[in-house]
């Protein structure tokens, strides 16, 4: 079965295959453009706006807090949230995270996955992404966690997609599980932009 027994169409087949590619492909291996093209993103946004298939396409609503762990340059922080740098202790445990500092700047999803970025409500998951080394990180990379409210953007819960296994897509396309990462962590996808309301850094001045 596809995402919904009533919408197994050519568009839905394309969406299923692209979602699997999105969930199952590390950023290191993304080539030839984002896994989800503009048509697929448009379909997802349309479904979220309509409220249809809400058992699968679940959107974070209201003032729910979302976190994103990243490694960014010193200048990135200085330009957007210098108050976060000023709030760091003069000295101390270099592995200790600061308390969240209020911030107010837009975050634009823009990378190998296109206009989509990964967020989570779980601090430990965000911290792991913020402290994981990557060849794409800036030379002067600083681990940081930015915070936003669900009401400032379009956030899609990825967990419901984990229940889709086997079926015609496994037989015809070798897709055994739509979202191979679905049960490992709580992940939401931000489509487009949001407004950052808080930021945390690790370390001291």
What positions do the PLM features span?
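Conserved NAD+-utilizing ADP-ribose enzyme module
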Residues: 1-117, 123-205
């Amino acid at each position: 079965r596809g995402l919904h027994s009533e919408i197994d169409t050519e568009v839905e087949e394309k969406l299923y295959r692209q979602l699997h590619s999105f969930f199952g492909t590390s950023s290191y291996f993304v080539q030839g453009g984002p896994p989800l093209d503009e048509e697929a993103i448009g379909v997802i946004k349309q479904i979220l706006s309509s409220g249809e298939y809400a058992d699968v396409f679940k959107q974070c609503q209201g003032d729910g807090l979302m976190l994103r762990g990243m490694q960014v340059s010193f200048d990135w922080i200085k330009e957007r949230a210098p108050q976060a740098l000023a709030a760091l202790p003069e000295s101390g445990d270099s592995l200790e995270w600061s308390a969240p500092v209020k911030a107010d700047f837009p975050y634009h999803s823009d990378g190998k996955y296109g206009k989509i970025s990964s967020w989570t409500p779980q601090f430990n998951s965000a911290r792991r992404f913020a402290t994981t080394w990557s060849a794409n990180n800036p030379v002067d990379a600083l681990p940081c966690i930015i915070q936003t409210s669900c009401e400032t953007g379009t956030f899609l819960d990825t967990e419901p997609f984990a229940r889709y296994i086997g079926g015609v897509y496994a037989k015809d396309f070798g897709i055994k599980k739509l979202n191979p990462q679905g049960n490992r962590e709580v992940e939401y996808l931000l489509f487009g932009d949001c407004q950052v309301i808080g930021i945390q850094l690790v370390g001291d001045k």
